[in-house]
Design a protein with these regions (language model features):
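Short-chain dehydrogenase/reductase
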Residues: 1-66, 154
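A short C-terminal helix-loop "cap" of Rossmann-like NAD(P)-dependent dehydrogenase/epimerase domains
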Residues: 9-13, 155-169
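Conserved Rossmann-like nucleotide-binding pocket used by diverse enzymes
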Residues: 17, 44, 72, 138, ...
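Structural signature of beta-strand start/N-cap positions in the alpha/beta core
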Residues: 40, 95, 138-140
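Catalytic loop of short-chain dehydrogenase/reductase
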Residues: 49-88, 95-134, 146-148, 167
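Short, flexible catalytic-loop segment of classical short-chain dehydrogenase/reductase
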Residues: 139, 143-154
Length: 180
């Protein structure tokens, strides 16, 4: 709430609804509120990821079953759960956008289970795009590079990843939240 409410105020919006993506009832309640308020939906930006930050240290091989399941649920399956409900409000088509990272394609130090989750997310995007394209709903993922976010703060040596990106990206700098 401490981050979302100021953002809503900055956008002159009084609508701030809770949505726990690990709970189907919470997701249903969220979309019911959207339906009552607007009746339809044009787009969704899925910018959700989570993993136990202690398991982003060391090696992927040490990932616990509990964290694997929770990370996949929050970071990947949540997109599918949101698409299931959003499509009902996108009667004239729409756009669903999620965020990925190069760690989905290649090994990145300390990214561990998040790399697996982002790989699964990217594959989910392809299948969701196939299913929902018939309903004129586009589903895409963007991978803008490492960005300083709350989720990124849990990754060990994230500063190193940012610096590496600054030296190796075509822009010779990291992408900002505002650019995305």
């Amino acid at each position: 709430k401490k981050r979302v409410i100021p953002l809503a105020e900055k956008c002159n919006s009084s609508m701030v609804y809770e949505c726990d993506v690990t709970n189907d009832e919470s997701i249903d309640n969220f979309f019911n509120k959207i339906s009552k308020e607007w009746g339809s939906l044009d787009f969704i930006v899925h910018s959700i990821a989570f993993s136990d930050k202690n398991e982003l240290k060391g090696g992927y091989v040490d990932t616990s079953r509990e964290n694997f399941i929770n990370t996949m649920n929050v970071s990947c399956y949540s997109l599918t759960a949101l698409c299931q409900r959003a499509r009902l409000l996108m009667k004239n088509g729409g756009q669903i956008l999620t965020l990925s990272y190069v760690g989905a394609e290649r090994v990145m130090p300390h990214y561990n289970i998040m790399g697996i989750a982002k790989s699964a997310l990217e594959t989910s995007v392809k299948y969701l795009a196939e299913d929902l394209g018939k309903e004129n709903i586009r589903v895409n993922a963007i991978s803008a590079g490492p960005i300083k976010t709350l989720a990124a703060s849990g990754i060990s040596d994230f500063r190193y990843i940012l610096k590496w990106n600054e030296y190796n990206s075509p822009l010779r700098r990291s992408t900002s939240i505002e650019e995305v």
